[in-house]
């Protein structure tokens, strides 16, 4: 990930600083406890694509159940 890009990217929800996780290919917002994926070298900065994080590991965000089920 380009350091210049990392310096200007912020969390789309809180506008906070992001941390690059090279191994997981994600940008982490510690304030919102979200991990944004990097796909083919491109950060996907959409809240719907982010995963919730817990200390020490990342877990997928559970989709909402459809109404009426």
Curated annotation (Swiss-Prot):
Gene3D superfamilies in alphabetical order: 2.20.25.10
List the InterPro entries.
Answer: Trm112-like
Give a single Pfam family match: Trm112p
Q: Which GO terms describe its cellular component?
A: cytosol
> PANTHER family under this entry?
PROTEIN PREY, MITOCHONDRIAL (PTHR33505:SF4), ZGC:162634 (PTHR33505)
- Which family is this sequence assigned to? Belongs to the UPF0434 family.
Q: What is this protein called?
A: UPF0434 protein Rmet_0534
Q: Which organism is it from?
A: Cupriavidus metallidurans (strain ATCC 43123 / DSM 2839 / NBRC 102507 / CH34)
